[in-house]
Each structure stands twice: as structure tokens, then as C-alpha cells.
Amino acid sequence: MSKEKILRTDGNVSRSGAVNAESYDAWASEYDRELANWGYEAPEQAAGLLKGHLEDFRDAPILDCGCGTGLTGLALRAAGATGHLTGLDASRSSLETSKQKAVYDRLEYADLNKPLPLGEGAVGGILCIGVLTYLEEAAIFKEWLRVLRSGGVVVFTSRDDFWQSRGIAEMLNRLELEGRWEALHVSRPMPYLPGHPDFADKVKAVYGVYRKS
């Protein structure tokens, strides 16, 4: 199945927007059900982290970067976010599913490996959950810093096996040393899909929380 191209424990994952969009398009109709069966709670965890670290969480404009079928949008609204919520994703079928949840103010197709269709300082918060695996990290970090206003907060997940092997920790630390942002929280590796037969023990998630200077 197409999802097997993206749920890989060996880390051999494509960063092609077109390839991954095709896989998620094929999976969109079953995505929510299967993720629930696998005990997926990352959206709720991430929304809670943003709420705990973003002072004006309730009213701030927020970007769901790689919104997929809208699970993170639902979690944000359930956590009390009432501000303008933008969802961007490269899977058109996932966007259609997300639209049915009626939690976003703006939903738009976007290749997240290209500049984000937002102005400088447009949002106060960003969530990027389960998406960094498919992106060029250095480029998306710079884009987050561009679209975040000063004092804005980004919460993201990274596969624990990529944290060092892809140099993610080093990139984050370099940007912090440059004074671009401040690390507020970096979690230990956490269960990501605890009910998945392959992911449960082999792949965990690190949650990062950073505030723009």
C-alpha cells in the first residue's frame, strides 16, 4: 500500500513533495481511523505544548504546517485556540478531509519544501507534527522564522533516529547560538504510534518547542 512508502522504520523516506502527496492522497480516507487504532496522540500533545508556551495561545494566529486530514486543527480548537487557523498541506485529498472538520479559517495546497505562502511575521504559533521527516530541515526552519512574529512559538516533532543522523539538533543549536530563537523544551524520545506493529518500539518522536527572538 502507498502508506508503506512513508511509514518506514529504516528511515529511507522520500523528501519529494509529489511522491509523498501521492501516498497521502491514497491514504486520506482511512488515515484518521488507522491512526486512532495505533494510539496516535501527537496532535493533542503538541497542542498542549503550544498552549503551555505561547502566552496569547487563545487568540494568536496559528499555522498548522502539514495539516493533513485536520487532526492537529481539531486538537488546537479543543485546547482552546480561537484565533485564525491556517492549514497547509501537499495532499489535496487530505485537505478535502480536513475541510470537512470545519476547524480551519484557511486551507491551502502548498509544497512545504518551497517558500510558505505567508507573509513575514504572519503567525504567532506554528505546529508541524509528523511532517519534518519529509522536509529539508534547514529550509523549513528559516521559513518558520520568517513567518513567525517576534515571540512566536513553534512546536514540531522529529523522528528520534533523525535527530542526530540528519543533523537536526546541530541545526537547531546553531540557530539558537545566532540568536534567532530560544529552545523552550526538547523532549526525550516519546511513543509516536504505540499501537503500530513496526513503529511501536523502533521509531519514537522528539518534541521540540522554540520561541523566536
Spans of model-derived segments:
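N-terminal, positively charged/glycine-rich alpha-helical extensions of SAM-dependent methyltransferases
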Residues: 1-30
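Conserved SAM-binding loop and adjacent beta-strand
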Residues: 32-48
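Class I SAM-dependent methyltransferase SAM/SAH-binding core
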Residues: 63-115
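A short acidic, Gly/Pro-enriched loop at the edge of an enzyme's catalytic core
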Residues: 116-126
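A short SAM/SAH-binding and catalytic strip from SAM-dependent methyltransferases
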Residues: 124-138
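A short glycine-rich, Lys/Arg-flanked "PGG" loop and its adjoining helix->strand segment in the class I
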Residues: 139-150
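Conserved beta-strand signature within the Rossmann-like core of class I S-adenosyl-L-methionine
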Residues: 151-160
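Class I S-adenosyl-L-methionine
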Residues: 180-213
